[in-house]
Swiss-Prot record:
SUPFAM superfamilies: PurM C-terminal domain-like, PurM N-terminal domain-like
UniProtKB keywords: ATP-binding, Cytoplasm, Ligase, Nucleotide-binding, Purine biosynthesis
Organism: Methylobacillus flagellatus (strain ATCC 51484 / DSM 6875 / VKM B-1610 / KT)
Gene symbol of the encoding locus: purM
GO biological process, one term: 'de novo' IMP biosynthetic process
A single MF term (Gene Ontology): phosphoribosylformylglycinamidine cyclo-ligase activity
NCBIfam families: purM (TIGR00878)
Name of protein: Phosphoribosylformylglycinamidine cyclo-ligase
Reaction equations catalysed: 2-formamido-N(1)-(5-O-phospho-beta-D-ribosyl)acetamidine + ATP = 5-amino-1-(5-phospho-beta-D-ribosyl)imidazole + ADP + phosphate + H(+)
Pathway(s): Purine metabolism; IMP biosynthesis via de novo pathway; 5-amino-1-(5-phospho-D-ribosyl)imidazole from N(2)-formyl-N(1)-(5-phospho-D-ribosyl)glycinamide: step 2/2
Gene Ontology cellular component annotations, sorted alphabetically: cytosol
Localisation: Cytoplasm
Its EC number(s): 6.3.3.1
Family under the similarity heading: Belongs to the AIR synthase family.
Length: 346
């Protein structure tokens, strides 16, 4: 091997192994708080081991992956990195939840040009917080320092979740019928979708991100983390026959609800049947956005849709309210008209 004085190291090329090691030590306590008894082994192995919980008699594994999108651009602009990790977890765990799956474990991918240990630790602390809210274990991840790939101070995130449900308890929407009721659970804000438009409207309006917006700094309103519905919904599934659910993400209400409806049925959602947060009214006003565009771009205050029989509405609302969720009866399922969309807002 060459041992000349002018040899070049990996660090000289822009990859700081010591910084990566320091990050691992910083985040170990965060990950430890998320552990479940089914986790076998600790952080640092080549693979993560997880024993399927014995409570599942005929388990089906359900997986999901997602990112945070251009909401990260606002995080860079505001130097606010403590909540985007919650967003990352929420986007995946809420997705598999709609099929009746309990999230079991989560992995993350953090990519940057130059690793800033403090920033990365804030992000991972948020990921761990999201995992705690979801009851799933943060069992591993990848930190990729790639010089020249990202602008200074920027990074990208991806998350991966695996959950499980008993095969006969999977929810696919196939039992949804005319007369069923559409319940909407409140969102925390824009969650993690529509942020390319949000950022454009912020730029066009010239709004001061530090200004007061209905009693909160505007920056906190637009950066509010995606709500995680796992624990309340899992309790609901134990008590009530849920026919279908939709996580309201990219595509808004009108594009996501149809994903769980059988052919020939339409969800008729009643405009004004729930409280729309001021942020969405502000966005609509700044961009002169049509109602139709709002409902297919943003969640407009509804982060999760639950479809149940009319006879189960009162019990479902009571249980969800007791778990801290704000829930409204926002529509009904009916026969689909000729040429009609599967979700309409009237």
């Amino acid at each position: 091997m060459n041992s000349e004085k002018n040899s070049i190291s990996y660090r000289d090329a822009g990859v700081d192994i010591e910084a990566g090691d320091a990050l691992v030590e910083r985040i170990k306590p965060f990950a430890k708080r998320t552990m479940r008894p089914e986790v076998l082994g600790g952080i640092g192995g080549f693979g993560s081991l997880f024993e399927v919980p014995k409570k599942f008699k005929n388990p089906v594994l359900v997986s999901g992956t997602d990112g945070v999108g251009t909401k990260l651009k606002l995080a860079f602009q505001l130097n606010k990195h403590d909540t985007v990790g919650i967003d990352l977890v929420a986007m995946s765990v809420n997705d598999i939840l709609v099929q009746g799956a309990e999230p079991l474990f989560f992995l993350d991918y953090f990519a940057c040009g130059k690793l800033d240990v403090d920033t990365a630790a804030q992000v991972v602390q948020g990921i761990a917080a999201g995992c705690e809210q979801s009851g799933c274990a943060l069992v591993g991840g990848e930190t990729a320092e790639m010089p020249g790939m990202y602008p200074a101070g920027e990074y990208d995130l991806a998350g991966f979740v695996v959950g499980a449900a008993d095969k006969d308890a999977l929810i696919d929407g196939s039992t949804i019928a005319e007369g069923d009721v559409v319940l909407g659970l409140a969102s925390n804000g824009a969650h993690s979708n529509g942020y390319s438009l949000v950022r454009k409207l912020i730029d066009l309006s010239g709004v001061d991100l530090e200004s007061d917006f209905y009693g909160r700094p505007f920056r906190d309103v637009v950066m509010a983390p995606t709500r995680i519905y796992v624990k309340p919904i899992l309790k609901l599934l134990q008590a009530i026959k849920v026919k279908g659910m939709a996580h309201i993400t990219g595509g808004g209400i009108t594009e996501n609800v149809p994903r769980v409806l059988p052919e020939g049925l339409t969800a008729e959602v009643r405009q004004g049947s729930w409280e729309i947060p001021p942020l969405f009214s502000w966005l609509q006003e700044q961009g002169n956005i049509t109602d139709q565009e709002m409902y297919r771009t943003f969640n407009c205050g509804i982060g999760m849709v639950v479809i149940v029989s009319a006879q189960d509405v009162a019990a479902a609302k009571a249980l969800l309210s007791a778990e801290g969720e704000q829930v409204w009866e926002i529509g009904r399922i009916r026969a689909q008209g000729a040429g009609e969309a599967q979700t309409v807002v009237v």
